[in-house]
Amino acid sequence: MKRLLFLFLLAGILINNHALQHNETIDLKKLAKIVLPPAYQTRVIGGRVTTNAKLGGYLVAMRYFNNFICGGTLIHELIVLTAAHCFEDRAEKEAWSVDGGISRLSEKGIRRQVKRFIKSAQFKMVTMNMDVAVVLLNRPMVGKNIGTLSLCSTALTPGQTMDVSGWGMTNPDDEGPGHMLRTVSVPVIEKRICREAYRESVSISDSMFCASVLGKKDACTYDSGGPLVYEKQVCGIVSFGIGCASRRYPGVYTDVHYVKPFIVKGIKALLSRSR
């Protein structure tokens, strides 16, 4: 936690200097929502209400001590794909549970316990590089309004439009998750533009890409770990951002196609140990 507080202070200094140079004001309360748990999570802004059934049943809600923390994607009846940062300071696997087949957080769907999880050894909160984790459930997630997605098969291209869904905040000033499932379509932003936007605060690595309609459509707090979907494939994992639907900073996602070798290896390791 001390390391995260240091990161918050460092980010505040860097971004505040950037703001002074551009005559801007930085809201440190909103910044804390992005840098410190539980808000290293994101939400859908500018979207529409939907249901898990309409989406295909692949979106799951991940809870820690029964508190909603992150979204996730069911990619196998026993495996969930999510963000590594969701597990930061939340290492007790017995305290994690996963709800499937729900559209409202208050609904009772199909609940499974987390048996194991693997996150990339390259992941560090200070860089957010390789923000990816795979989760093994204690029993298969099957039933009504439950489905799976395949992993992204092709590299992303700028302008490509994808759908992001989740229970995240719908307003940057909110204090908790939204209870209704929402979805929004966002385009992939050119990597050069993405890196330029974040150059004063964080390095955009090869494992990341940006997507949003600046100032209008984005993921936000509590959407973290959820999927960015293209043609029934999960191509992105909601990772982080500065603010939500910011005019300057687009949302940042983990590139599933880039991290696919880690995902495939992790799935094999988890399933081999589950037998």
From Swiss-Prot:
Residues linked to a glycan:
23
Annotated InterPro entries: Peptidase_S1, Peptidase_S1_PA, Peptidase_S1_PA_chymotrypsin, Peptidase_S1A, Trypsin_dom, TRYPSIN_HIS
Catalytic residues identified in the record: 85, 131, 224
The record's account of tissue expression is: Produced in the male accessory glands and secreted into seminal fluid.
Q: What is this protein called?
A: Seminase
Deletion phenotype? RNAi-mediated knockdown in males results in a number of effects in females mated with these males including impaired processing of the metalloprotease Semp1 and the accessory gland proteins Acp26Aa and Acp36DE, lower levels of egg laying after the first day post-mating, higher rates of sexual receptivity to subsequent males and failure to release stored sperm from the female seminal receptacle.
Q: Which gene encodes it?
A: Sems
UniProt-listed PANTHER family: AT20289P-RELATED, POLYSERASE-RELATED
Origin organism lineage: Eukaryota, Metazoa, Ecdysozoa, Arthropoda, Hexapoda
Q: Which residues form the signal peptide?
A: 1-19
Q: Does the keyword Transmembrane helix apply?
A: no
